[in-house]
Curated annotation (Swiss-Prot):
This is ATP synthase subunit alpha, chloroplastic. Keywords: ATP synthesis, ATP-binding, CF(1), Chloroplast, Hydrogen ion transport, Ion transport, Membrane, Nucleotide-binding, Plastid, Thylakoid, Translocase, Transport. It is found in: Plastid, Chloroplast thylakoid membrane. HAMAP family: ATP_synth_alpha_bact. Belongs to the ATPase alpha/beta chains family. It is an enzyme of class 7 (translocase). Gene3D superfamilies: 2.40.30.20, ATP synthase alpha/beta chain, C-terminal domain, P-loop containing nucleotide triphosphate hydrolases. GO terms for molecular function: ADP binding; ATP binding; proton-transporting ATP synthase activity, rotational mechanism. It comes from Cyanidium caldarium.
Amino acid sequence: MSNIRPDEISSILKQQIERYNESVKIENTGTVLQVGDGIARIYGLDNIMAGELLEFEEKTIGIALNLETDNVGAVLMGDGRDILEGSSVKGTGKIAQIGVGDNLLGRVLNALGNPIDGKPNPNSTDYRLIEFNAPGIVSRRSVCEPIQTGITAIDAMIPIGRGQRELIIGDRQTGKTSIALDTIINQKEENVICIYVAIGQKASSVAQAVTLLEEKDALKYTVVIAANANEPATLQYIAPYTGAAIAEHFMYKGLATLIIYDDLTKQAQAYRQMSLLLKRPPGREAYPGDVFYLHSRLLERAAKLNNELGGGSMTALPIIETQAGDVSAYIPTNVISITDGQIFLSSDLFNAGIRPSINVGISVSRVGSAAQIKAMKQVAGKLKLELAQFDELQAFSQFASDLDKSTQAQLARGQRLRELLKQPQASPISVYEQIPMIYAGINGFLDDIKIDRISLFIKKLQECLSNSYPHFYEAIKESKQLSKENEEVLKKAITEVKKNLSFI
């Protein structure tokens, strides 16, 4: 029998120890105590983060929202019908994130970024957190470039700048979505990436919007995120943050983006449902105490970045639905205080055939006027005041038996200006075509034209300027202002059109 040498044994043991590379995987696991109504109560999960993604035994994903002393309250991102009491849950160690990139353009996705348009899965290589901190004060610059909506009433009186948050507010069926979609359609020549987030809507309404964008060749630069009415409240709650993450990807690449949240009332209702089921204390209108933070952290992500960060921008157009025009309700007042202005749509104006049904008196843009082009400022400076005075006079004239000539003239001009601002859906007008229209109206050139023929006159005026004076539009595009020479050309064109069509 050969002698066993101790040094050989020790060297073999050392080699074995060095080769040993078994990694220990520690999993944070828990047990389902209770499940129902899209909520799960879980025992265990001691080292879980707030907002961490959880994976249930049957592969449903949830988000940990309530971290209590003896259990964790989680919301489910599916129906959760196969989750059983006593089944295991594990923490993923990840916060919700979404794949981003150029391959999302033209796609319709759900709130988790999965395609629902029947096309192949967009294999994204870049990922962004759904919840992300808004840019700080130093990272931003003031709003200085316009975002043209193509809607004359907005571009002239309530201008929106890149990086602004402008609320669209009104009752149901007053044309809020139409304004948002028209704005997307008008970005075709503007090189703006658009994200449309549909929250809690009927699938048929979303399909209609997608079809319209496709017909107008606008889907190629748009991403649609849809969390339909039949989907869990969790998905309706996170859909706006998913949209914001996609917009941020393009913004930090130096591009201009436009995001529409249609509508945040439904997101707040979904969040209220989740909070009440999680037994969080209810506040005003049964909303939880942090419902203001729900919207503020979302809308603060819209910004115009400084040049060091690439100069990109995210413009947000949140939509809020009111009940019987009540803008003093909880959610409307919250969002009005967060945003940089609001476009108020009136059901009375809508029913009177004035579309878009914008109530000029209480609509305002707090920062957009700095971004308005000089030519529009020159011609539209008095437009808002004229229309506000007209509304006041019109209300007064209903009770007055005889009116003096100056009042009659003011009423006549107001009616023509209002007619001028009427615009059919999905037919945006470029800002350069809006300028001659407003100039003609505000300077009294339409006062002697019958109201029912104003739209025809405007059409002929634009044709005349395009065909006979093509340099007119080119000069405005270059200089962004209406020079004395161009003003004379415009007056000449107006006189010609009036003469040819014998309007007087």
